[in-house]
Amino acid sequence: MKKCDWGAGQYLHQLLSENSLKRMVGETALVPMLVDGDKLIAFCTFAPLDDIQPTDMSPWIGFVYTFPDYREHRYVGMLLDYAESIATVMDREYIYISIGHTGLYEKYGYEFYKMDKDIEGEKSRIYRKALAVEGPDKDRRYESGTKWKAEIVKAARENVDMTAYCGFSCNHCFLGEWCGG
C-alpha cells in the first residue's frame, strides 16, 4: 500500500500505520485485500463511515485501488462483491461509495444517488447500490457473506481471551452482534 501511486492509497497506509483509520471511519472498519503470493493486487475499505460525515448512510466502500499490473481483470468487482456480501448479512438495504469521478462503479450496478460535501468541504458524488431484497442475487451474497463473517469472527477471536469481550454487551465489542456472544 505504501508503494501505491495514488495519493489516497498512501493516505490509507498512513492511517493504518498510525492506527487512526477506525477513529476516522468507525471501529468495525475492514480493509479487504487481494494478494498474489506476497504481492498486493487490490484493496479497499468497508466501514460504517467514509469521507461524507456526519451521515445516516452506511455502510461505505472506500479507498478502492488496483495496482497497475493487475488492472483489466475486474478485481474491483471481487472487492465490491465481498463488501456487498457482508452488507447483505448485516441486512443493509444499500451500500455506498463516495467518489469524485464517473464511469467505474456504474458497470457494477451502482447508481448516482446525490452530491454531498466531504470532510474537506469538497463536493463528492455519492453512489449507492440496492442490495436485492429477495432472489438469487441476495441468496448468493448472503451465502458468501456468511462465509466471510465466519472468517472475520475466527480471525478476531484468535489469540483473544474470551473474557475480554464476552462479559460486555455487543455495543462494546467491535464485532457487534456478529459473533453471537
Predicted regions and their residues:
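A short, well-structured alpha-helix characteristic of acyl/acetyltransferase catalytic modules
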Residues: 1-6, 137
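Active-site rim helix/loop that mediates acceptor-substrate recognition in acyltransferases
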Residues: 5-35
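Short hydrophobic/aromatic beta-strand or adjacent loop that forms the aromatic wall/cage
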Residues: 29, 122-127
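Conserved beta-strand in the GNAT
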Residues: 31-33, 39-49, 60, 65
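Active-site beta-strand termini and strand-to-loop segments that position acidic
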Residues: 35-37, 129-130
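Conserved acetyl-CoA pyrophosphate-binding loop and the N-cap/start of the following alpha-helix
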Residues: 70, 74-82
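Conserved active-site alpha-helix within GNAT-family acetyltransferase domains
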Residues: 89, 93, 99-123
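Cysteine-centered metal-binding/redox modules
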Residues: 141-181
